[in-house]
Amino acid sequence: MKYLRVLIALILVLTPQSSEAATSKSLAFTAEVWADNWFALYINGKKVGEDSVSITTQKSFNSETIKFVATYPLTIGFIAKDYVQSKSGLEYLGTPNQQIGDGGIKFQIRETASNKLVSVSDSTWKMKVGNTAPLNPECEKSTQPDIDCKFLNTSIASNWSSSSYIDKSWSSAKIF
């Protein structure tokens, strides 16, 4: 059974994908994650790591390697966030390069001992956007973006990272 979810809100939650293997013993895994700008990785409903660079740091792309121990089947989920300065959804406020924020994440997870690829980011993942801004892109060059830019916050279920969560209403991940 394979399913995955992403939630970008200016949080993007990539959520559960189950990966199955012939064993239920604990194994070591290595996740390589590239994110613009920040992420947290959840395995079987528990956070096993997060980006070492704070979300309040404006940086283009971060790369992290996270090692963890888990048992199959794996339920894999991510929360991903793009750096934003305010609810407007814009970056570089008040500068000539003020723009709509953009974010993304890609990853691969392998069994550490065998180097067997367990999961990789692709279009089979599901995603849910928690915070969308701006809803009116024409506000991008506004001198008052916190007033002129509209936004939408959508609640995310507290059990989104569990293997029993139903993600049928979530969209397919977008690949760029």
Task: Please state what every model-predicted region is.
Residues 2-9:
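Sec-dependent signal peptide recognition
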Residues 13-20:
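C-terminal segment of classical bacterial N-terminal signal peptides
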Residues 22-29, 34, 75-176:
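Accessory carbohydrate-binding/adhesion or oligomerization-edge regions at the termini
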Residues 34, 38, 42-93:
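Beta-strand-rich ligand-recognition modules
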